[in-house]
Amino acid sequence: MKLGILGAGGIASTMAKTVAGMKNVEAYAVAARDLERAQVFAQKYEVKKVYGSYEEMLADDEVELVYIATPHSHHYLHAKMCLEAGKHVLCEKAFTVNAEQAQKLFDLAKEKKLLITEAIWTRYMPSRKMINDIIESGVIGEVTAVTANLSYTVSHVERIRKPELAGGALLDVGVYPINFASMVLGDKVKDVKATAIFQNGVDILDSIAMVFEGDRMATLQCGAREISDRMGSIFGTRGYMQVQNINNPEKITVFDTEHKEVASYVVPEQISGYEYEVESCMKAIQEGKLECPEMPHAETIRIMKILDDIRKSWNYEIPWIE
């Protein structure tokens, strides 16, 4: 399968390096608004075709699947362009800036009979099944609570610090702890409360409490100005487990009620972790599906609505959207 990469930044580089180590897919084309930047990218990662505009790449009949690696403020526009050009789409998180945009893209993809999915990579990783298998084994009993945190020192980055780019920690970083909690506790959310510290009009430190059906709770934190331990903890009636790095799980450790380690698991060796979402897209496309089972459209919409509600509770309005 021939992959076109839309954007030539850091995550685009990771995708190009990942695809180079995969079978049955090639990084065939790259497009950037700056042709010279795209040329440097293509030379570095041995990408065959180079384009100085997104429109030119989308006019290339050889491109089958497009990976959107631009800021999330532009995801809706760029994904719409791809679909209208007849391309399948793997779009980075946050999928869009709100649920309304996401639904429009899903409706268009259905009309065009094209696959589109959100590249929230933790949904596709083997660690997800590993965590679920441990829970289902009953070793930690009934799961009643989850905590997770993820923070990076990225408040200086343009896409984070500018309200007009839908900036802030929530859409860029907060999607990971929210998805982590949802993968463990499910989709029956009864209540969400969130507080935030704002700087220059965007949230830079967020605390989120989610109450799920069955009297279960997730307590989450994300930030853009500090470093956190990236830990995810899942608590049960007979023990608990800790997931090292919720953004790219490395190790899962299980403890009993006496806080003694009873098991430890290391995730399988991987290229980068991006390969799983690409493999899922290829399989779905080959099977004629319009979504990936790891991140169905309904789940993207559900998460986007949670993000919308949180932002609304803060009176955080994106200037060009609301």
Regions found by a protein language model. Give the residues of each.
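N-terminal Rossmann-like dinucleotide-binding module
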Residues: 1-45
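Beta-loop-alpha module in the N-terminal Rossmann-like domain of NAD(P)-dependent dehydrogenases
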Residues: 15, 48-108
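Hydrophobic residues in well-ordered beta-strands that form the structural core
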Residues: 51, 91, 116-118, 147, ...
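C-terminal helix-rich "cap/oligomerization" subdomain common to oxidoreductases
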Residues: 65-67, 213, 280-322
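Rossmann-fold dehydrogenase core element
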Residues: 103-121, 142-146
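Predominantly a Rossmann-like dinucleotide-binding segment in NAD(P)-dependent oxidoreductases
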Residues: 122-193, 198, 317
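Contiguous beta-strand/loop segments that form the cofactor/metal-binding neighborhood of enzyme cores
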Residues: 179-251, 268, 279-289, 321
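Active-site loop of classical SDR/Rossmann-like NAD(P)-dependent oxidoreductases
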Residues: 267-279, 295
